[in-house]
Amino acid sequence: QDTYLNAKKYIEFYLVVDNGMFXKYSXXFTV
């Protein structure tokens, strides 16, 4: 299922961001 794979990718990306990488990119991105 492509939808499941896409969701998994998105979730994994979100987890990486939530792991602290967000602080590294927060300077580049405005949230």
UniProtKB/Swiss-Prot annotation:
Its EC number is 3.4.24.-. It comes from the Eukaryota. One of its GO terms (molecular function) is toxin activity. Its cofactor is Zn(2+). Residues 9-31 form the Peptidase M12B domain. It is found in: Secreted. It is an enzyme of class 3 (hydrolase). The keyword Cell membrane does not apply. Keywords: Calcium, Cell adhesion impairing toxin, Disulfide bond, Fibrinogenolytic toxin, Hemorrhagic toxin, Hemostasis impairing toxin, Hydrolase, Metal-binding, Metalloprotease, Myotoxin, Protease, Pyrrolidone carboxylic acid, Secreted, Toxin, Zinc. Inhibited by 1,10-phenanthroline. The keyword Nucleotidyltransferase does not apply. Expressed by the venom gland. Ca(2+) binds at E12. Monomer. Snake venom zinc metalloprotease that has potent hemorrhagic activity, fibrinogenolytic activity on the alpha-subunit of human fibrinogen (FGA) in vitro and provokes necrosis in skin, muscle and lung tissues. May contribute to local edema and ecchymosis induced by venom. Hydrolyzes model substrate (beta-chain of insulin) at Ala(14)-Leu(15). This is Zinc metalloproteinase alsophinase.
